[in-house]
From Swiss-Prot:
CDD domains for the chain: Ribosomal_L29_HIP
Annotated protein name in UniProt: Large ribosomal subunit protein uL29
Family statement: Belongs to the universal ribosomal protein uL29 family.
NCBIfam families xrefs: L29
A UniProt-annotated Pfam family: Ribosomal_L29
Keywords: Ribonucleoprotein, Ribosomal protein
Biological process per Gene Ontology, one example term: translation
Source domain of life: Bacteria
GO CC annotations, alphabetized: cytosolic large ribosomal subunit
Amino acid sequence: MKAQELRTKSVEELNAELVNLLGEQFKLRMQAATGQLQQTHQLKQVRRSIAQIKTVLTEKAGE
Protein backbone atom coordinates (compact mmCIF):
# COMPACT_ATOMS: atom_id res chain seq x y z
CA MET A 1 0.00 0.00 0.00
CA LYS A 2 1.30 3.44 -0.86
CA ALA A 3 1.85 6.16 1.71
CA GLN A 4 -0.65 8.43 -0.04
CA GLU A 5 -3.36 5.78 0.37
CA LEU A 6 -2.45 5.42 4.04
CA ARG A 7 -2.77 9.15 4.64
CA THR A 8 -6.42 9.08 3.52
CA LYS A 9 -7.34 6.48 6.17
CA SER A 10 -8.45 7.29 9.70
CA VAL A 11 -6.34 6.59 12.76
CA GLU A 12 -8.63 3.70 13.75
CA GLU A 13 -8.24 2.08 10.33
CA LEU A 14 -4.47 2.50 10.49
CA ASN A 15 -4.29 0.95 13.95
CA ALA A 16 -6.39 -2.00 12.80
CA GLU A 17 -4.12 -2.49 9.79
CA LEU A 18 -1.06 -2.23 12.03
CA VAL A 19 -2.34 -4.96 14.36
CA ASN A 20 -3.12 -7.14 11.34
CA LEU A 21 0.38 -6.67 9.91
CA LEU A 22 2.08 -7.34 13.24
CA GLY A 23 0.22 -10.66 13.43
CA GLU A 24 1.23 -11.45 9.87
CA GLN A 25 4.85 -10.59 10.67
CA PHE A 26 4.78 -12.96 13.64
CA LYS A 27 3.44 -15.80 11.48
CA LEU A 28 6.07 -15.18 8.82
CA ARG A 29 8.85 -15.10 11.41
CA MET A 30 7.74 -18.44 12.82
CA GLN A 31 7.63 -19.92 9.33
CA ALA A 32 11.12 -18.60 8.62
CA ALA A 33 12.45 -19.99 11.89
CA THR A 34 11.10 -23.45 11.14
CA GLY A 35 12.26 -23.37 7.53
CA GLN A 36 8.76 -23.40 6.05
CA LEU A 37 8.84 -19.93 4.50
CA GLN A 38 9.33 -20.15 0.74
CA GLN A 39 8.86 -16.49 -0.19
CA THR A 40 11.28 -14.68 2.08
CA HIS A 41 10.56 -11.33 0.44
CA GLN A 42 7.26 -11.22 2.32
CA LEU A 43 9.13 -10.46 5.54
CA LYS A 44 10.63 -7.34 4.00
CA GLN A 45 7.30 -6.24 2.53
CA VAL A 46 5.46 -6.60 5.84
CA ARG A 47 8.25 -4.84 7.76
CA ARG A 48 8.14 -1.94 5.31
CA SER A 49 4.35 -1.69 5.49
CA ILE A 50 4.51 -1.58 9.28
CA ALA A 51 7.07 1.23 9.11
CA GLN A 52 4.92 3.19 6.65
CA ILE A 53 1.85 2.91 8.87
CA LYS A 54 3.81 3.96 11.95
CA THR A 55 5.18 6.95 10.05
CA VAL A 56 1.72 8.07 8.96
CA LEU A 57 0.39 7.62 12.51
CA THR A 58 3.21 9.83 13.81
CA GLU A 59 2.41 12.45 11.17
CA LYS A 60 -1.26 12.42 12.17
CA ALA A 61 -0.36 12.72 15.87
CA GLY A 62 1.60 15.88 15.11
CA GLU A 63 -1.31 17.58 13.41
